[in-house]
């Protein structure tokens, strides 16, 4: 009769710490694995995720949150930044929040944000 996982866990829970250590060593020897290696591999994976999030973002999206009071000036700025026609630029401004440009470098995104804000828009970089 095979033991269930629950039975095995209950048996381990009743063992002393020394018995558990001996059990782990016996399992490592029998199956040719190392519990320390599994922990060492898992730890950097979690660290890499945090490091990736901590790295500086290199691509930015310029998002028009709202046109503000000077809608005509914002439409002109959107046309200048995107190269869109009047109808498309107006639709983008009317549909705010909307993404004006995607995947820009930090400098280009800051320049576009500054131009739109000077025209009266509220802008976010994502």
Curated annotation (Swiss-Prot):
GO BP annotation list: translation
InterPro entries: Ribosomal_bL12, Ribosomal_bL12_C, Ribosomal_bL12_C/ClpS-like, Ribosomal_bL12_oligo, Ribosomal_bL12_oligo_N_sf
SUPFAM superfamilies: ClpS-like, Ribosomal protein L7/12, oligomerisation (N-terminal) domain
Keywords of this entry: Ribonucleoprotein, Ribosomal protein
A Pfam short name: Ribosomal_L12
Membrane-spanning parts: none
Domain of life: Bacteria
GO molecular function per UniProt: mRNA binding; structural constituent of ribosome
GO-annotated cellular components: cytosolic large ribosomal subunit
HAMAP family linked to this entry: Ribosomal_bL12
Function: Forms part of the ribosomal stalk which helps the ribosome interact with GTP-bound translation factors. Is thus essential for accurate translation.
Quaternary structure (record): Homodimer. Part of the ribosomal stalk of the 50S ribosomal subunit. Forms a multimeric L10(L12)X complex, where L10 forms an elongated spine to which 2 to 4 L12 dimers bind in a sequential fashion. Binds GTP-bound translation factors.
Family: Belongs to the bacterial ribosomal protein bL12 family.
Protein name as annotated: Large ribosomal subunit protein bL12
Originating species: Teredinibacter turnerae (strain ATCC 39867 / T7901)
């Amino acid at each position: 009769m095979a033991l269930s996982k629950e039975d095995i866990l209950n048996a381990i829970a009743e063992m002393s710490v020394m018995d558990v250590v001996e059990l782990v060593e016996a399992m490592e020897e029998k199956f040719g694995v190392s519990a320390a290696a599994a922990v060492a591999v898992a730890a950097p994976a979690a660290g890499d995720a945090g490091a990736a999030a901590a790295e500086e973002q290199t691509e930015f999206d310029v998002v028009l949150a709202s046109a503000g009071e000077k809608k005509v000036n914002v439409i002109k700025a959107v046309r200048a930044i995107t190269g869109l026609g009047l109808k498309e630029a107006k639709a983008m401004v009317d549909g705010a929040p909307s993404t004006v440009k995607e995947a820009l470098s930090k400098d280009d995104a800051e320049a576009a944000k500054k131009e739109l804000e000077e025209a009266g828009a509220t802008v976010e970089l994502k």
